[in-house]
Amino acid sequence: MAPDTPSQPASRRDELLQLAATMFADRGLKATTVRDIADSAGILSGSLYHHFKSKEQMVEEVLRDFLDWLFGRYQQILDTATSPLEKLTGLFMASFEAIEHRHAQVVIYQDEAKRLSDLPQFDFVETRNKEQRKMWVDILQEGVADGSFRPDLDVDLVYRFIRDTTWVSVRWYKPGGPLSAEQVGQQYLAIVLGGITQSQGDKHA
C-alpha cells in the first residue's frame, strides 16, 4: 500500500490492498477467498489476478507496508530521543499509534504472520521481529546502565511483557470507542514505567 500521503490519490491497486486488509482482519486469511475480495470490490476474480498472483501476495504486501512504516516511525524516534526513557516512551506510544491508525494491518500481523512463517516470502517478518526485539532490549539495557531503570531488571522478560501489552491490545481495542489508542497506551505505559523505573530514593540509596 502507498505511504501516508493524503495529497496523492490511492491507486486502484492500493484500494484493493486496503479492502483485502480489512477483510483479512475481519474474517481471517483462511476464510477470505479471492472471490470474496473481488465481489466486495465489484470486479471479477480474474481482474483481481491481474494485480496480484494470490491472496498470499496481498498479505505479503500488507505486512511489508506495515513493518516498513512501523520501523520508519521507530527510527524517527530513536534519531531524536535523548534518553532511554524517552526512547521507550516513544516506541511504546508509536505501537499504539499503529493500533489506532493501521488497525487492520496490526490484526493481520498478530493473527496471520506466524501461520505464514513457513513460506519463504514471509522470512522478512521474522527478520523484523528480531530487529524489534534487539531495539527494545538495547533500550532497556541502556536504561539499566544509566540508572533510569531498576538494576535487577530482567530485560528479556520486560521486553516480552511490553510486546504483549502493546500488540495483543489490538484483539480487543476498536477504533472509535470511548478511549483512543493513545489514551489506552498512556495508561499501559504508566503501569510499565511504574514497574521498571527507579525512584529518586532508590537511585541515591
UniProtKB/Swiss-Prot annotation:
It comes from the Bacteria. SUPFAM superfamilies: Homeodomain-like, Tetracyclin repressor-like, C-terminal domain. Residues 10-70 form the HTH tetR-type domain. Residues 33-52 bind DNA. Coiled coil: none annotated. Signal peptide: none annotated. InterPro entries: Homeodomain-like_sf, HTH-type_TetR-like_transc_reg, HTH_TetR, KstR2_TetR_C, Tet_transcr_reg_TetR-rel_C_sf. Keywords: DNA-binding, Repressor, Transcription, Transcription regulation. GO terms for molecular function: DNA binding; DNA-binding transcription factor activity; transcription cis-regulatory region binding. GO terms for biological process: regulation of DNA-templated transcription. Controls the expression of a small regulon that may play a role in the utilization of cholesterol. PANTHER family: HTH-TYPE TRANSCRIPTIONAL REGULATOR RUTR, HTH-TYPE TRANSCRIPTIONAL REPRESSOR KSTR2. Homodimer. This is HTH-type transcriptional repressor KstR2. It comes from Mycolicibacterium smegmatis (strain ATCC 700084 / mc(2)155).
